[in-house]
Amino acid sequence: MDMKKPFELRVKPIKNGTVIDHITANRSLNVLNILGLPDGRSKVTVAMNMDSSQLGSKDIVKIENRELKPSEVDQIALIAPRATINIVRDYKIVEKAKVRLMDEVRGILRCPNPNCITNSDEGVENRFYVISEEPVLLRCYYCERLIEADEIESQF
């Protein structure tokens, strides 16, 4: 019996740009929303539910000819706290960094408590303390409401 190796489709490497690896499974579309993609110009590759020895399964996003702003990386950390950002130049990874949640998150999310002062006309900036990184759990600085990962994800 002739056992042939199954055909394996591989995504071609990018010459320049960013690869976001180890995204929590099924959250790559949230990452695209954070980055304002698709935008009609950028070449983007999305791989979802890929096998991962670390996570079980993961998503990957490749964006050609674009490097991320620190504010974008901060937002990605909220929905994919184990993500890795790889900067690619001339087909080589020149920089690799894990996303990191800051101790405090400001101005990115809104508090889901309708009675929180940040949801009034006072103009108070949203501010949250990071209680847990995995899973992500935040506490509102003002009303102390806990915000879990699914509530965070729904805002992107």
Curated annotation (Swiss-Prot):
One BP term from GO: pyrimidine nucleotide biosynthetic process
One GO cellular component term: aspartate carbamoyltransferase complex
Stretches assigned to coiled coil: none
Domain of life of the source: Archaea
A GO molecular-function annotation: metal ion binding
Known cofactor(s): Zn(2+)
UniProt-listed InterPro entries: Asp_carbamoyltransf_reg_N, Asp_carbamoylTrfase_reg, Asp_carbamoyltrfase_reg_C, Asp_carbatrfase_reg_C_sf, Asp_carbatrfase_reg_N_sf
Record note on cofactor: Binds 1 zinc ion per subunit.
Keywords on record: Metal-binding, Pyrimidine biosynthesis, Zinc
Binding site for Zn(2+): 111, 116, 140, 143
Function per UniProt: Involved in allosteric regulation of aspartate carbamoyltransferase.
Subunit and partners: Contains catalytic and regulatory chains.
HAMAP family: Asp_carb_tr_reg (MF_00002)
Assigned protein family: Belongs to the PyrI family.
PANTHER family the record matches: ASPARTATE CARBAMOYLTRANSFERASE REGULATORY CHAIN
Protein name: Aspartate carbamoyltransferase regulatory chain
Gene source species: Methanothermobacter thermautotrophicus (strain ATCC 29096 / DSM 1053 / JCM 10044 / NBRC 100330 / Delta H)
Gene: pyrI
